[in-house]
Amino acid sequence: MKKSAPGIACLLALPFLLSGCGAVGSKSLSLSVIYAVSSLLAVGILVGYACFSKKLKSWLLMLLVCVTVVNTGYFMLSVSGSLEVALWSNRISYLGSVFLPFTMLMSIMDVCKIKRPKWMIPVLLGVGAIVFLIAASPGILDIYYKEVTLRIVDGVCVLQKVYGPLHSIYLYYLVAYFSCMVAVIMYARHKAHSVSISYAVLLLIATLINIAVWLLEQLVDIEFEFLSVSYIISELFLLGVDILARSLQNQ
């Protein structure tokens, strides 16, 4: 435990350093640089976990993959230069965003030691695919965005959007997943499973924070995707908690 303590402390401290970077929005530092750093960090965390973790957790690994895809999309959008490339970049970011809550729910179910029915994963993946196709429709259909144009703000490409009739479906999708996570944790407590409820709750809190950040971006006109930083913070936090939990188990 003593040997791993410095590494745990560093890992848990990194989110606070990153959160300070997330507030940077001045013209002196291009937002594209922040997106690039977030993407590289996501790749580094993914590779580091895949290569150096003694016991890989498949759903946590998939979560890291999703965050890498999201942040790559954000970076590509910021340097896109044309509406067509920007829309494809937006689709890439949504590809990761749509399946991220799925990996969180699966992780919580694993932590709570709740068996999944065979139909669950295919059905949830199917629902996620439908939501993704709706979110990826701008430029083809006007159901998610009625109108979308490309603007350049302080040298960074951003999409100017007018929301369509099905834009709210993504919010309902997130709320449904969050409700399922709460239900899983409550069920595990009721059944008194021998599990780390506290770890599951931390996963739930990380999900809630990211949903809150997404809602803030929808309600307030902000030219920076704070989720790119929020996801990295969540990754590092969850990895730190995972390392700490394993260290305590090995005592």
Where are these regions (language model features)?
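N-terminal secretory/membrane targeting signals
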Residues: M1-G20
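Extracellular-loop-to-transmembrane junctions of the mid-late helices
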Residues: V24-S38, L133-V184, E217, D221-L227
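Transmembrane helix-loop junctions and nearby membrane-interface residues
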Residues: A50, F75-S82, L105, V111, ...
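Interfacial "cap-and-anchor" motif at the non-cytosolic start of specific transmembrane alpha-helices
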Residues: H193-Q251
